[in-house]
Amino acid sequence: MQKYSEMSKEQLQALKKELDQQYAEIKAQGLALDMSRGKPSVDQLNISMDMMDVLSSSTDLRCETGVDCRNYGVMDGIPEAKRLLGEISEVDPEHIIIYGNSSLNVMFDTVSRSMTHGVMGNTPWCKLDKVKFLCPVPGYDRHFKITEFFGIEMINVPMSPEGPDMDMVEKLVSEDPAIKGIWCVPKYSTPQGYTYSEETVKRFARLKPAAPDFRIYWDNAYSVHHLYDDEKEQDFLLEILDECAKAGNPDMVYKFTSTSKISFPGSGIAALAASKANLDDIRKYITVQTIGHDKLNQLRHVKFFKNLDGVHAHMSRHAAILRPKFEMVEATLEKELGGLGIGEWTTPKGGYFISFESMEGCAKKIVAMAKEAGVVMTGAGATYPYGKDPKDSNIRIAPSFPPIDELEKAAKVFVVCVKLASVEKLLAE
C-alpha cells in the first residue's frame, strides 16, 4: 500500500471523497457501541458465577484459625486469603495486607495517608512546599487522577517496550527530594501492554532516591492476565520486592494487586504487599480506619480458587474469551492501516488494552469522529497526566467489553476515522 504521506494532493482529495462517503454510510447505521473502558464482558463475568454458590447458610464460616468470618476482627486479612493473594503477588503471606474490594482505593488511601501523616516518620507531604510524582506515559488515567486530586505535580516519563526511561527516572529521583513516588503498571502495562524488562526492574530496585520517603507504586493489576496459555507466549516479570531487598532498599516499594479482573470487578479482594517496616507503619492507620474488611468475601474467594493453580485455570477461561477479540482488532488494524504510515499499535500478550499512536495532532479528532459515528472510546489524552497528550496521538483501545460482532463493527468504524482524520491533516499542511 502507498503511504498517505507519499500521495499527491489530487490522490488525497479523491481518497477523502471516498472516505467521506464511507463515513456517511456508517453514521446512517445509527450504531451505539462502547470501547471506552477495560471492563470484563458478560461472558467473562459468567465464568465466576459458581462463586456465588460457594457459601450458603449451612457453610462453616470460620477461617483456618477458627475466627468466625461473620463477625468483627482480623484487621489485615484471614490467613488463607493472605496465602492466595501472596501467591498471585509472588510474595510470602507475612508481607501482605488484605483490604476490601478495590486496589485503586488502597492506592488512594496510601497517597492520602502520606499527605496527612507522612511515610514512616517522615514529614507529612501536606507540610512540604512541593510534592512530585513521576508518571510513565502513556499510562493509567486513574493513577493520574489520584495525584492530581491531591495537587501533586506530575512529571511525564516516556515508556518503551522495556519500561520507563530509566536514565530519566534515575536522574530525577536522585536529584530531587520533592519526588516522592512513581506510578507503575509493570506487567502488560496500561495502555501499551508492555512488561518491564529484568534490567528495568533491577534498576528500579537499585534507585538512590534523594527523598527517604520515596516509594515505587507498583500496580500489579495484570499479574496473571495472559492472553495465551503457552508459557512461551506469556511475558515474565521479575519480582520487585525481592529485588529491592537484594539491593538494600527493602522499604522502597508498595505492590498493589486485586482480583477485580479475575473474579468480579468491584466485588473482589485487594491487597498490598510491602516490607515488614512498611506494613507495621500502615497497620497503625488501618487499626483506626477499620475493624476489618469483608472476611466472607475473602473466604468465598479462597474456597472458589483454592490456590494459584485454580487462579491460572480460571484465567485461561478469561483468555479464551479475550484472545479472539484482541486478535480480531489487531488483524483489522493491520489489514486496513498496515503500510499506510498513519498509525502504529501494540500487540500485547496480556492485559486489557491495545495502544494506538495516530499521526501527531489527530487523536482527539479521531475519537470525536468515532463518537459521532456511534462508537464511544476512551477520551484522547486520558493516558497522560491532566488529560494532556503533548502530541495528541495516543488512543487507548479497549476490546474486552463488547461482544465480538459489535467489536468488529467498532474496529471498522475506528479505521475509517483514522484514515479520514489523517487525510484531512495531510491536506491541511
Residue ranges of predicted features:
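Walker B catalytic acidic pair
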Residues: 220
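Conserved core of the PLP fold type I
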Residues: 67-212, 223-248, 363, 413, ...
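N-terminal "arm"/small-domain region of PLP-dependent enzymes with the aminotransferase-like
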Residues: 2-76, 81, 86-87, 372-375
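Conserved PLP-binding active-site segment of the aspartate aminotransferase-like
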Residues: 355-360, 377-417
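Conserved core segment of the aminotransferase class I/II
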Residues: 99, 241-323, 336, 423
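Short amphipathic alpha-helices in soluble, non-transmembrane regions
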Residues: 366-372, 410-415
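Conserved glycine-rich beta-strand-loop-beta hairpin in the small C-terminal domain of fold type I
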Residues: 316-330, 342-357
